[in-house]
Amino acid sequence: MPDTRLRGLYLITPDSPDTTTLVAQVERALRGQPALLQYRSKQRDAALRLGQARQIAALCREAGVPFIVNDSLELALATDADGVHLGREDGDLDAARRALGPGRILGVTCYNEWPRAVAGCAAGADYVAFGAVFPSATKPAAVRAPLELFVRGRRELDVPLAAIGGITLDNAAQVIAAGASLLAVVSDVFDAPDPGARAAAYRTLFDA
């Protein structure tokens, strides 16, 4: 049975050393009830990341939104996260699946690489992500993933597909039409005057 959590807005936090501001931003955005929220931080300070992740995890639990950690299985386990999202350099997928157990979410970044998506599914991924779909301010040098990957993925893979990279309300519908079940978004929500309202607007795209 498909995981009903894996459809809708996949909100990703901006990278910020200012914990107070970040937590306040997340609290506002969660009012829009995204499907998932991912804590993503490239800060080198492990203590800062742990502190931020714990506070955001608590907000997600209160809001009833699954909390995912980017890049770090260790941090996901330390914060009792609902799942982890791993890229190419973030460890063995089979080991991550075993450590998480069957009830938590394992997501895999596949860039524009079809074989990696197939391997991720074989390792027990709950969803696979392709991107960047559009040019992205968050990762300007990211490879581009054509919408045809989503068309093929919907036809040939048994897990939901996440789209990431430059997604906005203006271009989201075509990505959903191609086959994406999750839209991973940072800037278009967190840069909005009302992040909660912006997040809620994405939800309506999936209700149509």
From Swiss-Prot:
GO cellular component, one term: cytoplasm
Pathway: Cofactor biosynthesis; thiamine diphosphate biosynthesis; thiamine phosphate from 4-amino-2-methyl-5-diphosphomethylpyrimidine and 4-methyl-5-(2-phosphoethyl)-thiazole: step 1/1
Cofactor note: Binds 1 Mg(2+) ion per subunit.
Organism: Aromatoleum aromaticum (strain DSM 19018 / LMG 30748 / EbN1) (Azoarcus sp. (strain EbN1))
InterPro entries tied to this protein: Aldolase_TIM (IPR013785), ThiamineP_synth_sf (IPR036206), ThiamineP_synth_TenI (IPR022998), TMP_synthase (IPR034291)
Name of the molecule in the record: Thiamine-phosphate synthase
Leader sequence segment: none
GO molecular function ontology, one term from the record: magnesium ion binding
Coiled-coil ranges from the UniProt annotation: none
Its job: Condenses 4-methyl-5-(beta-hydroxyethyl)thiazole monophosphate (THZ-P) and 2-methyl-4-amino-5-hydroxymethyl pyrimidine pyrophosphate (HMP-PP) to form thiamine monophosphate (TMP).
Catalytic activity: 2-[(2R,5Z)-2-carboxy-4-methylthiazol-5(2H)-ylidene]ethyl phosphate + 4-amino-2-methyl-5-(diphosphooxymethyl)pyrimidine + 2 H(+) = thiamine phosphate + CO2 + diphosphate; 2-(2-carboxy-4-methylthiazol-5-yl)ethyl phosphate + 4-amino-2-methyl-5-(diphosphooxymethyl)pyrimidine + 2 H(+) = thiamine phosphate + CO2 + diphosphate; 4-methyl-5-(2-phosphooxyethyl)-thiazole + 4-amino-2-methyl-5-(diphosphooxymethyl)pyrimidine + H(+) = thiamine phosphate + diphosphate
SUPFAM superfamilies (UniProt xref): Thiamin phosphate synthase
PANTHER family per record: THIAMINE-PHOSPHATE PYROPHOSPHORYLASE, THIAMINE-PHOSPHATE SYNTHASE
EC code: 2.5.1.3
Xref: Pfam families: TMP-TENI
Enzyme class: transferase
Binding site for 4-amino-2-methyl-5-(diphosphooxymethyl)pyrimidine: 38-42, 70, 109, 139
GO BP terms, alphabetized: thiamine biosynthetic process; thiamine diphosphate biosynthetic process
Binding-site list for Mg(2+): 71, 90
Named cofactor requirement(s): Mg(2+)
Keywords: Magnesium, Metal-binding, Thiamine biosynthesis, Transferase
Family according to the record: Belongs to the thiamine-phosphate synthase family.
